[in-house]
């Protein structure tokens, strides 16, 4: 029996236990000679046919597809694999890893990083890290790729402590990319930001860095729900007055965020912080043109509330405060206009 005949027999009879010993016994030259045979098997068993009166599907059984997939990983070049296969099943590659790793696996993985479907069925953070540690993958995945897989474990504090690199490096990638982090709250019994709060409280994540990154994330071109989620993380950690004063540059940067909810969250904090002697009045006043340019009434009202407090407490800044408030006179809201006029009449010269 030729090797072509034996491969056909294994596939036709669904002899799953026989395929790996068969592949292990092939020389490099024999693998190449099997390519035309495998091409025909791919075409035959992947063809959609009518299975019964009301059902259509591929001609091959799940076991036949597994046999073909394993064979493809061993004998195909990257070009041939792309032509015949949509992706790699991680559990199938794991069957081969003890004795064989496709030479092109790094290239295939890298290509997948730039696509919506990464090219691997069943890939997750655990498998990814296992492959890196085993040398299956010799490249370094992009931070966005790592974050995309890690986010699915954000409610498992035990798992997140399994590898030092997870908390030391990888968890910070979640502040940089949209991975649906805000949806993790739905799986933590109403405890928002559970893992972040847990690791901060236990000293395993630097508290000031978490606070700072949550503010920086708001302006990282994320969708409005996720931007609000990060702003909410900052307030959920109950930053002290001293922490807020230290992070004033990052706090003020949020005021120019493209979404209104994070802006209002921060304005709510500033209503209390603005009376502190170390509050950077001039830096805040430089943001008022952006705040009054918003078409959201609540932003105008919150900004005016802060300006009123500042005018009352900081006599040396009253002229500048009144000029800043005057920018809001273009508002279409009569209540906003009247409050501005009252502020100027009260504190202006």
Protein language model regions, located:
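Non-catalytic protein-protein interaction scaffold segments in large eukaryotic complex-forming proteins
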Residues: 1-199
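Eukaryotic acidic, Ser/Thr-rich intrinsically disordered low-complexity regions
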Residues: 3-5, 322, 326-349
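HEAT/HEAT-like alpha-solenoid repeats
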Residues: 8, 212-220, 249-260, 285-297, ...
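Alpha-helix initiation and capping sites
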Residues: 15-16, 31, 204-208, 223, ...
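Flexible loop/turn segments at the boundaries of HEAT repeats in alpha-solenoid HEAT proteins
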Residues: 203-204, 237-245, 273-281, 310-319, ...
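Residue-level detector of extended alpha-helical repeat arrays and alpha-solenoid scaffolds
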Residues: 227-230, 263, 300, 337
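Hydrophobic residues within the alpha-helices of tandem HEAT/HEAT-like
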Residues: 230-238, 266-275, 292, 304-312, ...
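Amphipathic alpha-helical interface segments within eukaryotic helical scaffold
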Residues: 235-241, 245-278, 285-290
